Amino acid sequence: MSRSPDAKEDPVECPLCMEPLEIDDINFFPCTCGYQICRFCWHRIRTDENGLCPACRKPYPEDPAVYKPLSQEELQRIKNEKKQKQNERKQKISENRKHLASVRVVQKNLVFVVGLSQRLADPEVLKRPEYFGKFGKIHKVVINNSTSYAGSQGPSASAYVTYIRSEDALRAIQCVNNVVVDGRTLKASLGTTKYCSYFLKNMQCPKPDCMYLHELGDEAASFTKEEMQAGKHQEYEQKLLQELYKLNPNFLQLSTGSVDKNKNKVTPLQRYDTPIDKPSDSLSIGNGDNSQQISNSDTPSPPPGLSKSNPVIPISSSNHSARSPFEGAVTESQSLFSDNFRHPNPIPSGLPPFPSSPQTSSDWPTAPEPQSLFTSETIPVSSSTDWQAAFGFGSSKQPEDDLGFDPFDVTRKALADLIEKELSVQDQPSLSPTSLQNSSSHTTTAKGPGSGFLHPAAATNANSLNSTFSVLPQRFPQFQQHRAVYNSFSFPGQAARYPWMAFPRNSIMHLNHTANPTSNSNFLDLNLPPQHNTGLGGIPVAGEEEVKVSTMPLSTSSHSLQQGQQPTSLHTTVA
């Protein structure tokens, strides 16, 4: 860029390095063509490059073509003029920002709460998950203990809660506003911030953690004191609520609980989708300071001493001494997020009704719970449903969102099917020829009315018959496991050596059951497949024998025992 030596303009930038020209470079023109550069670039071109002028490509002479150093008077004059211009610029900015002293800017992520009792006037308390921490991540909490907000309820504290996200602040306002706690009605709204006095003076603020504004805020969110008295800032808040509701209709519903990997604790999970007039049926599992709400409308009645809306079950015995953080508070005080609200928050104009009410948060405790299970090792119950409720088991009725899968029911049906299949099996392991020889050698087949029954030939044959019965469980181990249930295959009593022989033949009930699942047969009823056998002396029998061992069912056996009869009979059919 060329300029004449006599030009009296403001310093400009060097065309090569784009740095402002210093005062000494104002009258420096190294080339006869009048192309002005700074002395630093001129020295670099001559020493490190080709030494040619960037404009006319002529070699630079040893001495600059025009160089007139400024005198001290000229330097002082230039400095004074520059300072004066800077002061004028600052004054102009201050005059433009002077009207901002009475302007307040609504902060979308700042919640202002009025009406806090002294018990709640603690930043660490308000940051807890039971309180404002449940709505989102909090950046900072500032408590104002000034009594300027005191009303008919007496002096109270106010708090500024700054959230990371603006939607968390709106959710907190909808859930906390007009809630009665400790006999005081809380009022919550978006907070406003004024401009820093140093910013209004166009000066650097010395406070690193200054909470005031140091830059111009949104014009739509800026309101004067007169406009705020007219409620303009509340209209802006309702507008933000409408916009957020259009983007996310379920913004009042908190996100699902998550597990902290470091502490292995469940973070709070709260849902605000229960109507105001219906108390929430939920199961609260407490562990330390954290709690988890599980919605369950079909849960049976809780144990005595616990409210139905919030039964508490301790997870570990080490936390039995856990209490609400507010020891010494009045027990009758209402919970901040209970459903007993005196002034429900109005729905913004122009919006359809919310699918969920914001006033159903019931986990902001104000006093120790009087009948909590944390104080006792036992759980009082009065019915079977109480046990189910005490240990977290729901009723048999499936919730709407359940898939209808009941592991116990499926297992029970599978076991019943397995037993039915065992009863319907027709092909069982056959007896060995030796056992058939023993049984046939000790029994005789009689003809007549009593044919078909096994009659002992001698007293010793009864011992053989007893040994035959004792061998059956060993040869059929699959029936051994059912002996505790079906015990009709035993010989009761020791009144005589062979008491069953003393009964008349007509008093013994003839049982000829076949093992099929539809009949009233005992599971020990055996249909043995026909097989070849040898008679006495090793002579083979031409025909095939079908041996059927039948026992009395459980019901028939008990009936026979009441009449003093022998419940067991052995029936052999020879084909």
UniProtKB/Swiss-Prot annotation:
Q: In which pathway does it act?
A: Protein modification; protein ubiquitination
Impact upon substituting residue 49 to A:
Strongly reduces interaction with E2 ubiquitin ligases
Q: Name one GO cellular component term.
A: cytosol
Q: Give the Gene Ontology MF terms in alphabetical order.
A: RNA binding; ubiquitin-protein transferase activity; zinc ion binding
Reactions this protein catalyses: S-ubiquitinyl-[E2 ubiquitin-conjugating enzyme]-L-cysteine + [acceptor protein]-L-lysine = [E2 ubiquitin-conjugating enzyme]-L-cysteine + N(6)-ubiquitinyl-[acceptor protein]-L-lysine
Gene Ontology BP annotations = nuclear-transcribed mRNA poly(A) tail shortening; protein autoubiquitination; protein ubiquitination; regulation of megakaryocyte differentiation; ubiquitin-dependent protein catabolic process
Positions of post-translational Phosphoserine modification? 71, 301, 324, 432, 490
From which residue to which does any coiled coil extend? Answer: 68-104
Q: Which segments constitute the RRM domain? A: 109-189
* Compositionally biased spans, kind Polar residues: 281-299, 307-322
UniProt keyword terms in alphabetical order: Coiled coil, Cytoplasm, Metal-binding, Methylation, Nucleus, Phosphoprotein, RNA-binding, Transferase, Ubl conjugation, Ubl conjugation pathway, Zinc, Zinc-finger
* Function of the molecule: Has E3 ubiquitin ligase activity, promoting ubiquitination and degradation of target proteins. Involved in activation of the JAK/STAT pathway. Catalyzes ubiquitination of methylated RBM15. Plays a role in quality control of translation of mitochondrial outer membrane-localized mRNA. As part of the PINK1-regulated signaling, upon mitochondria damage, ubiquitinates ABCE1 and thereby recruits autophagy receptors to the mitochondrial outer membrane to initiate mitophagy.
| Quaternary context | Interacts with CNOT1 via its C-terminus but does not stably associate with the CCR4-NOT complex. Interacts (via RING domain) with UBE2D2. Interacts with ABCE1, PINK1 and PELO.
Task: List the protein's name.
Answer: CCR4-NOT transcription complex subunit 4
